[in-house]
């Protein structure tokens, strides 16, 4: 079970918790990411509506995503709320928790290869990476994208070769793909060749960018579709703007016309394994 580097959660933090004991006035839950820490959820924080029977909402052994509303480390008190968690926040926290589980499994594999126990791995690798990146899997993703040297100085050097091997094999580089369409016309006998040359030049220029891939698809005159895959949305938009400027310039100089068309809800996130 992945655990956080901090001893106590912070107010406003979302946590994964397991219901341990239920009473008429509330429930006690164990914090999965904070071993040995127990929290209390008052019945008024279980649901937005009036709760007649708390057991209609909570069961022993049930895992929930809750929001930390009060923390008193001196007394060891932690208060949680279920009603203050939206569906979107719950989904995001569960995704984060799954990423932490994956990071933990990969670190266990690395520790095994080095002949170290997980407590040592947690202390030497997990804690410094979480403190620097916020979550360990994000550090692994950066290493997959930019090279293992991004971890240098944060973890002991002896970990780097084995972490590189594991990250290369198991960690996918997150990417974003956006698409758009161009309407291009060049009223000349060689208009098709001019358009083709403009698209090829724009594509090849963009593909020189690190971790960027551009693809054109002919949809039928005068429409052409462009797909841009990049490390993040902002980079993809930057590349699209650059390509559009290049195509519009070349086509205009050739006496033609080019228009960039954007469609709503055509942005999607994908994952591409690092080659």
UniProtKB/Swiss-Prot annotation:
Gene Ontology molecular function: ribosome binding; RNA binding; translation initiation factor activity
The entry's keywords: Initiation factor, Protein biosynthesis, RNA-binding
The keyword Protein biosynthesis is annotated on this UniProt entry: yes
Domain S1 motif: 12-83
Pfam families per record: EIF_2_alpha, S1
Oligomer status and interactors: Heterotrimer composed of an alpha, a beta and a gamma chain.
Function per UniProt: eIF-2 functions in the early steps of protein synthesis by forming a ternary complex with GTP and initiator tRNA.
Descriptive protein name: Translation initiation factor 2 subunit alpha
């Amino acid at each position: 079970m992945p655990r956080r580097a901090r001893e106590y959660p912070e107010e406003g933090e979302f946590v994964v918790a397991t219901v341990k004991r239920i009473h008429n006035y509330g429930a006690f839950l164990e914090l999965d990411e904070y071993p040995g820490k127990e929290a209390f959820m008052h019945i008024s924080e279980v649901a937005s509506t009036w709760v007649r029977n708390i057991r209609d909402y909570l069961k022993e052994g049930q895992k929930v995503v809750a929001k930390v509303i009060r923390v008193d480390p001196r007394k060891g008190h932690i208060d949680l709320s279920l009603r203050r968690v939206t569906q979107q926040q719950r989904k995001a926290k569960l995704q984060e928790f799954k990423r932490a589980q994956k990071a933990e499994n990969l670190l266990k594999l690395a520790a095994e290869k080095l002949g170290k126990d997980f407590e040592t791995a947690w202390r030497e690798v997990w804690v410094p990476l979480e403190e620097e990146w916020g979550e360990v899997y994000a550090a692994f993703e950066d290493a997959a994208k930019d090279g293992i040297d991004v971890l240098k100085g944060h973890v002991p050097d002896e970990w780097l070769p084995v972490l590189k091997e594991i990250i290369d094999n198991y960690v996918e580089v997150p990417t974003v793909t956006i698409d758009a369409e161009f309407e291009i016309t060049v009223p000349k006998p060689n208009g098709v060749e001019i358009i083709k040359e403009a698209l090829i030049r724009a594509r090849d220029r963009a593909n020189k960018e690190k971790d960027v891939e551009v693809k054109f698809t002919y949809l039928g005159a005068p429409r052409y579709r462009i797909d841009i895959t990049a490390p993040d949305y902002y980079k993809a938009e930057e590349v699209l703007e650059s390509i559009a400027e290049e195509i519009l310039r070349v086509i205009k100089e050739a006496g033609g016309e080019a228009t960039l068309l954007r469609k709503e809800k055509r942005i999607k996130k994908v994952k591409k394994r690092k080659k």
